[in-house]
Design a protein with these regions (language model features):
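Sec-dependent bacterial lipoprotein signal peptides
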Residues: 1-23
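Short, conserved, GDST-rich strand-edge loop motifs in beta-rich repeat architectures
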Residues: 84-97
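N-terminal export/targeting and maturation segments
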Residues: 23-72, 82
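Surface-exposed loop/turn elements that mediate protein-protein interactions on large endomembrane-trafficking
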Residues: 45-63, 94-119
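Intrinsically disordered, low-complexity segments
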Residues: 14, 28, 58, 88-91
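C-terminal partner/receptor-binding element of secreted or periplasmic proteins
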Residues: 109-145
Length: 145
């Protein structure tokens, strides 16, 4: 009888763990950036940069989804963004990244002014215009966590 109770307990724990790993929101996160900005991930492809209002609230996007890489210095936040496209395998409007729709963004931290979307050539030109150091290199968001 004791073994039966332990077995039931273990089964319930296992089922609970499986249910929790399937719950939306467990993989969501935010990463703080300079100037009260954050990278905010609300789902696999909804990753954006927004101003941080409080510990759990953010303002409207300043760099839209899907942000895949970022870098920053004392004056600027740089970002690489992929546009989204409807998933051809889904009929419910689910969107996936479009690797052919690449944009770059520069956010001036002090003023909040945003430059973008930019193609790669214009991005490099703006970096040079703003005298952003070549040591400020875009990094994948997954590597920053």
């Amino acid at each position: 009888m004791f073994n039966k109770h332990i077995f039931r307990y273990l089964v319930m724990v296992f089922i609970s763990l499986i249910m929790l790993t399937g719950c939306a929101g467990l993989a969501d996160y935010s990463l703080d950036l300079p100037g009260n900005y954050s990278i905010v991930r609300t789902s696999a492809h909804q990753v954006k940069v927004a101003p941080k209002i409080s510990e759990s609230h953010w303002g409207s996007d300043v760099i839209p989804t899907k942000v895949t890489e970022v870098a920053w210095d004392d004056n600027y936040i740089l970002a690489k963004q992929l546009g989204l496209v409807n998933d051809p395998k889904s009929s419910n409007g689910y969107q996936i990244p479009n690797n052919d729709d690449v944009h770059f963004w520069i956010l001036e931290i002090k003023s909040g002014e945003v430059f973008g979307p930019l193609d790669e050539v214009n991005f490099v030109e703006k970096k040079n215009e703003f005298d952003i150091s070549e040591s400020v290199i875009l990094k994948k968001i997954e590597d920053l966590k």
